[in-house]
Amino acid sequence: MQKTSNTLALGSLTALFFLMGFITVLNDILIPHLKPIFDLTYFEASLIQFCFFGAYFIMGGVFGNVISKIGYPFGVVLGFVITATGCALFYPAAHFGSYGFFLGALFILASGIVCLQTAGNPFVTLLSKGKEARNLVLVQAFNSLGTTLGPIFGSLLIFSTTKMGDNASLIDKLADAKSVQMPYLGLAVFSLLLALIMYLLKLPDVEKEMPKETTQKSLFSHKHFVFGALGIFFYVGGEVAIGSFLVLSFEKLLNLDSQSSAHYLVYYWGGAMVGRFLGSVLMNKIAPNKYLAFNALSSIVLIALAIIIGGKIALFALTFVGFFNSIMFPTIFSLATLNLGHLTSKASGVISMAIVGGALIPPIQGAVTDMLTATESNLLYAYGVPLLCYFYILFFALKGYKQEENS
């Protein structure tokens, strides 16, 4: 079988980004689902995101080195296999009714996503040749399609089978925990199927086809890369923090049940999908850094309004932040890795480590929310945590993205 062309390779990678989005957003369903089952505090529930995104920090550098040796195509296949393993482990985790087991399975699942992320993002940029930001935004739009459909299927398959009330017995809680078994087992099978397809496609290893550079330069000597990695840290942290507590916020402030509240996640992540498809067109006319600056500023305004105004308007404002999140990750990534040459795979590994922001920022917001709950204060004040994240993104878009003359 001949090697796949660049266009077909880019097309096949959309399945990778779709699955990453679909699986990642299910954490936003797991948090309100497992919180009452295991009687968790907001902080303890946010450990779901801590374990999932903590894998990025622990495994990002590891996979960056591994992929630089085995190449992007095999990195993608390896990522799908590890992801399938983590998904399959949800079955015994639910059977034994162990929150710790769930967190362990999540870490393995997330390690697979880290591998896919580390291989997938630079793979797209190297295949794009001059259209890095636009093409990465386009394939990330399919990631957003996954994050849009994830809450719909997650709420239907998980919340619809939940029968637990406030005074549920241990047997009822274990039964509700098992509602995640079949959805995640299905994801395991789908991941293995994608691994087989990617292997048979024989994707081109574009990095090995690049001419070798004669000079070696430290990755961290590129300031625009360092600022960009920090930008990814704060972007993922802010986005995940808002998504993690959106369902719980709707439940608390609007007295909605979990399944009804979960539907609003569709608008949050669906907004990102619309924004990415729109961004793939507008980036032909607007400079990526200017587009990023506008979206960061818009997010700051929306979150500030939510904190100040409160009520339904606040929650709808927070939901609309998803639209402006749309182009942030691919734009920051492409600006941070521009002109890095053979350092690109290692840079991708470091950026994958920076996604640990999704592990650290939500627990901080969770701890703040617990404190506000204890003092019967406005829970929306906790959204000041992700607000600070977007201020850094604005800095990167205005100044941090600039490359030094000799880089």
From Swiss-Prot:
Gene Ontology molecular function, alphabetical: D-glucose transmembrane transporter activity; galactose transmembrane transporter activity
Compartment(s) of residence: Cell inner membrane
Domain of life: Bacteria
Keywords carried by this UniProt record: Cell inner membrane, Cell membrane, Membrane, Sugar transport, Transmembrane, Transmembrane helix, Transport
An annotated GO cellular component: plasma membrane
Membrane keyword on record: yes
One Gene Ontology biological process: D-glucose transmembrane transport
A family per Pfam: MFS_1
Keyword Ubl conjugation: no
Lipid bilayer topology: Multi-pass membrane protein
Transmembrane segments annotated in the record for this chain: 11-31, 47-67, 70-90, 96-116, 139-159, 180-200, 225-245, 263-283, 300-320, 321-341, 349-369, 378-398
Cross-referenced PANTHER family: L-FUCOSE-PROTON SYMPORTER (PTHR43702), PROTEIN TSGA (PTHR43702:SF3)
Family statement: Belongs to the major facilitator superfamily. FHS transporter (TC 2.A.1.7) family.
Role according to the record: Intake of glucose and galactose.
Full protein name: Putative glucose/galactose transporter
Organism: Helicobacter pylori (strain ATCC 700392 / 26695)
